[in-house]
Amino acid sequence: MRKIAAMLDTLSASQNSFYLIKEFNKLQSDNQYSPVCFYNNLSATPVKTHFACMNISYYSHFDGVTITTSIDTANTAIKTNNNSKKFLYLWDMEWLRNPMDFNYVNSVLSNDDIAIISRSNSHSDLIKNYCNKEVAGVVQDWNMEQLEKIVWT
């Protein structure tokens, strides 16, 4: 069984949450996969989930593929000592919208313990320019076919 987890700040109404839930609900119907979501802040979801959703405090017991969705959740995953293959899916460049410490963001992005997945080719170029690290791949809107090629190869 392939275990896959998403780590988010919140599952509240957003494009990111909508596509994540849509794709994880599809995975749940396949016996090959065991999707789970870890969140920092509990909130109402935009769509009903058909998979487990837990507080981030349970993450230390997870052993599978982890896909984080923000600089802060990526930092949490990096600092957690568990048997998980870790990825950061950069849906947007949050440091461009909100002031963030360059050293903090760069230390997370350039960490060898986490691979970066971008949402588009233009995001890939921006990430490489920002932290001098190649992305592991490009995934549009949580597309599981694209994601599988990156995380399980």
Q: For each predicted feature, which ranges?
A:
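N-terminal pre-catalytic "stem/leader" segment of glycosyltransferase-like enzymes
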Residues: 1-62, 142-153
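Histidine-centered beta-alpha loop that forms part of the nucleotide-sugar donor binding/catalytic region
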Residues: 9, 90-94, 140-141
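Hydrophobic anchor at the start of a short beta-strand
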Residues: 31-36, 84-86, 133-137
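Extended catalytic core of nucleotide-activated donor transferases of GT-like folds
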Residues: 43-110
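A short, active-site helix/loop in glycosyltransferases that binds the activated sugar's phosphate group
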Residues: 76-77, 113-135
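C-terminal functional extensions of proteins
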Residues: 127, 141-142
